[in-house]
Amino acid sequence: MAQIKFVIKDKFDSNDPIFKSLVDTISNYNNVNKLKLIINITYNEGGEVAIMLAFVATIEKAVLNNSNLTIELRFGGFAMSAAAFVFCYFVFYADIPRVRVLSNTRLSVIYHKPRMKQKKSSNFIFANDPIKMKTLAKQQQTELISYTNQFDDVWGAVVAIYEMGGEAFDPSLLSSYNGNGDFAFTLSNRVFKGGY
C-alpha cells in the first residue's frame, strides 16, 4: 500500500498550500491501487473554520467515494478550536469507514463554540450574542450561525457518548461551553477510532 504524508502546521489557514496539495492528491486518485493518506495535525491552534470544514468534507467525500483509500489522522500535543472540532468530529460524531484517528503523544483537546473576529477590531463575536452579531454583515451572520450549529451537533455527540458510559456530565462544563468558554480534556496516546 502506497502512503502519502501531509502535515498541517499551526492552524487551518487558507494560505497554507497543504490544503491544495491534499485536494489535488485526492482528486487525482484513481481508486485502483490501495493508498493511505497520513495527515499529521499537531500543536494546532485552530484557524479558519471554513477551511477546516472544507478539509472535513474532503476527507469524508474521498473515503466514501474511494474504497481503496484510507486516511489516518495523527494528532499530538494540542488540538484547539477548529482542530478540536476535527478530532471530535471523527472520533465522536461521524461514522465514516477507513478513517483512523490516533495520537502518538498525550493530546490536549480544547473545544469551544466558533467565533468570528470583528473587522477593524480584536473582538471576537459568538452567534449567541445578538447585539454583537448585528455588527457582522448578513453573510457573516449566516455563516457563524451555521458553524455554531455544526459545532453544537458535534459537542452533543461528545456529551452523549460520555453519558452512555454511565457518567453524568458536569453541569459546569456544559455551562462553560454554552457560555462561550472552553472545554478542555487531555487524553493518553492511543488509537481513538478505526483499527482498519
Features from the language model and the residues they span:
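N-terminal organellar transit peptides
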Residues: 1-196
